């Protein structure tokens, strides 16, 4: 993998801000002609610095946007328990992100549901049905202050 230089970082920042930039506009933003810009983008894609292009959807308009942060503890932290949980949780469309954690909980989820009834249905029909789940703690977000689409570059 090649080291990222100043131009690569400019490309990544520009695409993180607007993944729909035309190649010509991107080239102009980073100060290169079209061909070298495209070559760099392809390399960044091949080396998995760019993992895809996504539309940021309005969660509130589409699903009601109740965000719930859910700490999940498992009965055991052995490989089979962890694998079983991860295999099942990735299939739940309400789960926007899932992180394995250190500390009191084994996993932290961000769940998006329409309302409290939808969250209760998620708990009873999905989360508590996963074998090995021993404890669940929920915290409801009051508002979203900010959401970044890329790490600091």
Curated annotation (Swiss-Prot):
Keywords: Activator, DNA-binding, Transcription, Transcription regulation. SMART domains: HTH_ASNC (SM00344). GO terms for cellular component: cytosol. GO terms for molecular function: sequence-specific DNA binding. Residues 4-65 form the HTH asnC-type domain. GO terms for biological process: response to amino acid. It comes from the Bacteria. Residues 23-42 bind DNA. Positive regulator of the bkd operon for branched-chain keto acid dehydrogenase complex. This is Bkd operon transcriptional regulator. It comes from Pseudomonas aeruginosa (strain ATCC 15692 / DSM 22644 / CIP 104116 / JCM 14847 / LMG 12228 / 1C / PRS 101 / PAO1).
